[in-house]
A protein has these predicted regions:
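Carbohydrate-interacting/catalytic domains
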Residues: 1-8, 12-182
Length: 182
């Protein structure tokens, strides 16, 4: 999800044990014999689909206005977050990457716009060999008018350990402020 072209060497799409050899074919049998290779192939396939389906990942991949940090300095939890911008503001994506094995049931992150944000990709999904910490089904996070990370609005999201999560704004926030009784 970081800007720039992606390079994946032959055989990496299945997590091949050995480096590709010009005199041999890729070891496709690994995806049939080992579940981890099958999971890795499903992960790369989903990443490729995400990359081609989301203009924010390629339209401004080589310009400064295609990438904005939300939080690059979270050393306590080792989670970085950023926005990838496309030509259309409705294509913008919020990305969180957790570089630590700790998972978080409720992690607050600033978002560039108010709204309901759908999780459109989670690298911790069971079909990729992950734990499914955030649940089996995609889910939505509604922004609150609670400033965080230099943004006017924020969301709370489940963040799996050692995983990446991609969110896309679906529409206006369905957040309802709590009713204060007097």
């Amino acid at each position: 999800t970081h800007p720039g072209a992606k390079l994946n060497f032959m055989g990496n799409e299945i997590g091949q044990f050995i480096e590709w050899r010009y005199y041999e074919s890729i070891q496709w049998f690994l995806t049939e014999e080992y579940e981890t290779h099958k999971h890795h192939q499903a992960f790369i396939k989903a990443l490729n689909h995400l990359y081609t389906a989301e203009p924010a990942l390629y339209e401004r991949g080589y310009t400064d206005d295609g990438f904005t940090w939300i939080d690059a300095d979270n050393s306590k939890q080792s989670i970085v977050s950023f926005v990838r911008q496309g030509e259309d503001i409705d294509d913008d994506l919020v990305i969180l990457i957790n570089f630590d094995p700790a998972s978080y049931e409720s992690f607050r992150v600033g978002v560039p716009r108010e709204g309901d944000w759908d999780v459109i990709f989670d690298s911790d999904r069971p079909e990729f060999g992950g734990s499914g910490y955030a649940g089996e089904e995609p889910y939505t996070c509604s922004s609150e008018p609670y400033p965080w990370n230099g943004q006017m609005d924020s969301i709370e999201i489940k963040v799996p350990g050692l995983a990446g999560v991609v969110l896309k704004r679906r529409g206006p926030s369905s957040y309802k402020p709590p009713v204060v009784e007097e």
